[in-house]
Amino acid sequence: MANIKSAIKRARQNVKLRQHNASARSMYRTYIKNVLKAVESGDQEAARAAYTKAQPVIDKAANKGLIHKNKAARIKGRLVARLKAMAA
């Protein structure tokens, strides 16, 4: 356990931030899973709607530093590729 006052405060903050980050990470993963489920079911409209909802959540995770911006681009690109493959 930390002895210095500022280190004690940082330890307290880290607990809160870890919980917040875990929640946000879970949320963006859930949105991705919703898109993948819609693609698997074969419903194009539901898949497009799910992707439209997921896109800003993924971008927000990247902007907040939860994931790297390149990873966000890669995830969105893969989802779009699945949507296009489903349409073809």
UniProtKB/Swiss-Prot annotation:
This is Small ribosomal subunit protein bS20. Gene3D superfamilies: Ribosomal protein S20. GO terms for biological process: translation. NCBIfam families: S20 (TIGR00029). Pfam families: Ribosomal_S20p. The gene is rpsT. Keywords: Ribonucleoprotein, Ribosomal protein, RNA-binding, rRNA-binding. It comes from Legionella pneumophila subsp. pneumophila (strain Philadelphia 1 / ATCC 33152 / DSM 7513). Belongs to the bacterial ribosomal protein bS20 family. GO terms for molecular function: small ribosomal subunit rRNA binding; structural constituent of ribosome. InterPro entries: Ribosomal_bS20, Ribosomal_bS20_sf. One of its GO terms (cellular component) is small ribosomal subunit.
